[in-house]
Swiss-Prot record:
GO terms of molecular function: chlorophyll binding; electron transporter, transferring electrons within the cyclic electron transport pathway of photosynthesis activity; iron ion binding; oxidoreductase activity, acting on diphenols and related substances as donors, oxygen as acceptor; oxygen evolving activity
Modified residues (N-acetylthreonine): 2
Protein name: Photosystem II protein D1
Catalytic activity: 2 a plastoquinone + 4 hnu + 2 H2O = 2 a plastoquinol + O2
Keyword terms, alphabetized: Acetylation, Calcium, Chlorophyll, Chloroplast, Chromophore, Electron transport, Herbicide resistance, Iron, Magnesium, Manganese, Membrane, Metal-binding, Oxidoreductase, Phosphoprotein, Photosynthesis, Photosystem II, Plastid, Thylakoid, Transmembrane, Transmembrane helix, Transport
Gene name linked to the record: psbA
Compartment(s) of residence: Plastid, Chloroplast thylakoid membrane
Cofactor note: The D1/D2 heterodimer binds P680, chlorophylls that are the primary electron donor of PSII, and subsequent electron acceptors. It shares a non-heme iron and each subunit binds pheophytin, quinone, additional chlorophylls, carotenoids and lipids. D1 provides most of the ligands for the Mn4-Ca-O5 cluster of the oxygen-evolving complex (OEC). There is also a Cl(-1) ion associated with D1 and D2, which is required for oxygen evolution. The PSII complex binds additional chlorophylls, carotenoids and specific lipids.
Natural source organism: Medicago sativa (Alfalfa)
Residues reported in the UniProt entry to bind a quinone: 215, 264-265
Enzyme class: oxidoreductase
């Protein structure tokens, strides 16, 4: 007689949940980072939409002069924004239950802090989810490393800068014109255009755009044609095909003759590493620059640095920039103080004779 023994499936509900969360067969990979990413990003997005449409004015400067940012309070898509949390709150953690009422929470700009903190946690988890999926598929981790650049930039403007300045009211408003206002005020107070890390960031972004356009145009111009002249060359590609889709030798020869031989990559892997690394490193430096300027380690100041033999100042473009900075700073928070802080710090001369 033969006995057949079946092992009972002892997998628990928790075990099935873990397998589902970490399965790479799902249409969208969730992962353990996704368990935190999904609710935080949904919260940030939902509150942003509601606040952008209907949030009441916020006392951003803490001087009882609220500024409206929502559509229902007179703004449009261009000038609307989520107004940063009030200077009266500073860096305090300000959830809804810390306010005496929801009206007070809205008046002090509570939605901004809620959105920003959930957003930063969400995008950090998205980066972790990229690493997690790469790990489970046996891929290298560089996708998450590249994504760390925009995560670092967002963290710098939404968290590190307010910490350095002592208040979430100094964070970047969540809107189009609010972003421009933040940039102008940042230039006025920190002279960011004269900071070397910002210069590296500009080189990274613009250089990355240039290299991306050059690479795309070279590849598109050196496709191996698999179709007739009457068909699109794109129809000659089949997803997953083993053959090369373009002639890298032809592209290398073209670019080497256009510039010089060693300006062109002859290794596809090192080429694509360069295309990824250039803008990523540039944005890393920009985020680092924002984080240092948050604590007032500002850009270079060459104000009145060129003088003639008689000691008279010979104005340079640096002096023009400094004059523009003062003008922008005067316009910033004009109701909170009458003069730029660096001018107001100078003791006024006596007028009593």
């Amino acid at each position: 007689m033969t006995a057949i023994l079946e092992r009972r499936d002892s997998e628990t509900l928790w075990g099935r949940f873990c397998n589902w969360i970490t399965s790479t067969e799902n249409r969208l990979y969730i992962g353990w980072f996704g368990v935190l990413m999904i609710p935080t990003l949904l919260t940030a997005t939902s509150v942003f939409i509601i606040a952008f449409i209907a949030a009441p004015p916020v006392d951003i400067d803490g001087i009882r002069e609220p500024v409206s940012g929502s559509l229902l309070y007179g703004n449009n898509i261009i000038c609307g924004a989520i107004i940063p949390t009030s200077a009266a709150i500073g860096l305090h953690f300000y959830p809804i239950w810390e306010a005496a009422s929801v009206d007070e929470w809205l008046y002090n700009g509570g939605p901004y802090e809620l959105i920003v903190l959930h957003f930063l946690l969400g995008v950090a988890c998205y980066m972790g989810r990229e690493w997690e999926l790469s790990f489970r598929l046996g891929m290298r981790p560089w996708i998450a490393v590249a994504y760390s650049a925009p995560v670092a930039a967002a963290t710098a403007v939404f968290l590190i800068y307010p910490i350095g300045q002592g208040s979430f009211s100094d964070g970047m408003p969540l809107g189009i014109s609010g972003t421009f206002n933040f940039m102008i005020v940042f230039q006025a107070e920190h002279n960011i255009l004269m900071h070397p890390f910002h210069m590296l960031g500009v080189a990274g972004v613009f250089g990355g755009s240039l290299f991306s356009a050059m690479h795309g145009s070279l590849v598109t111009s050196s496709l191996i044609r698999e179709t007739t002249e009457n068909e699109s060359a794109n129809e000659g590609y089949r997803f997953g095909q083993e053959e090369e889709t373009y002639n890298i030798v032809a592209a290398h020869g073209y670019f080497g003759r256009l510039i010089f031989q060693y300006a062109s990559f002859n290794n596809s892997r090192s080429l694509h590493f360069f295309l990824a690394a250039w803008p990523v490193v540039g944005i890393w430096f920009t985020a680092l620059g924002i984080s240092t300027m948050a604590f007032n380690l500002n850009g270079f100041n060459f104000n009145q640095s060129v003088v003639d033999s008689q000691g008279r100042v010979i104005n340079t473009w640096a002096d023009i920039i400094n004059r523009a900075n003062l003008g922008m700073e005067v316009m910033h928070e004009r109701n909170a103080h009458n003069f730029p802080l660096d001018l107001a710090a100078v003791e006024a001369p006596s007028i009593n004779g």
